[in-house]
Amino acid sequence: MENEINDLTNEVNELINPDYMDDDELQGIVGAEIDDAIDFIDNTVSPIRAKATEYYRGEPFGDEEDGRSQVVSMDVRDTVQAIMPSLMRIFTSGDKVVEFVPHGPEDVAMAKQATEYVNYIFQKDNQGFLVMHSAFKDALIRKNGVIKFYWDESYETQTSELTGLDDMALATLSGDPTVSLDIVSSYPAFEQTEEMAMLGQEAPLLHDVRATRRMPKGKVKIEAVPPEEFLIDRRAKSIEDAQLVAHRRVVTVSDLVAMGYDRDEMESLASDTDEMDMNVERYTRNPALTTSTADRTDKAMRKVSYIEAYIKVDRDGDGIAELRKVCVAA
């Protein structure tokens, strides 16, 4: 149904504006930009960052000779470890990572409330200390520390088995827009009597149902992004002037369904392999991530490559490229 609505919307837009870009053309442009950014990160940037990780760990260079010293200098690690406490102290030595300053007496209460709220969101609700620590360390070792903040529009799903519901209870539950029902079985509440049979009356039905409640669980999310998951246009001088900025990651079908995507469509895209296993930076940083001990048989936990892209594109044909968010799953 959703695809039919999108197709109809595209047809209407094309009739109104012949220069309007349809979904297929947009998908082609986004796909080409993403492929180019992946090639840039995986083949140009990641090998350099992987080498920096090896220097940090003091791993052998591979040119050692028998009878010669095998000692590797740990200068990179020592320098990073010496800088980290000072960096963390700047932001975490006090109780307030962020403080809002009032412009006048009337703003004092609001500024205090905003300060308490933002600090709670960052420090308590999102483990701000660990977020900063990860990003700072990535920046010192791998030249890039990425922190992502956004409103997480995830949903919480709860499934319950309910038995013995009468018609009124079933109707009440069916009227709840957050609940979807699957009737498992229906049966008479009691045996039909002879008198009821003579009057043509039937015994009321009881129902056993499976109820799935889907509730929004939105919150501010702040997280450190592994450098190899961050994609950017190779021509960009900064995030602001980049034609494409994207976050790629491997998620499960369950994660995507919780985001609101169609279950059947996501299951058709799932696989048992991880496309990022070939990234040398990821392997160097944590070889265990590329080692699979067992494949999950349940479809909900199968893997899907998910890319959240922000791209500048002129879709409405007015000659001005707008920033658009396009999410791609494969």
Where are these regions (language model features)?
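Extended, helix-rich architectural segments
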Residues: M1-A330
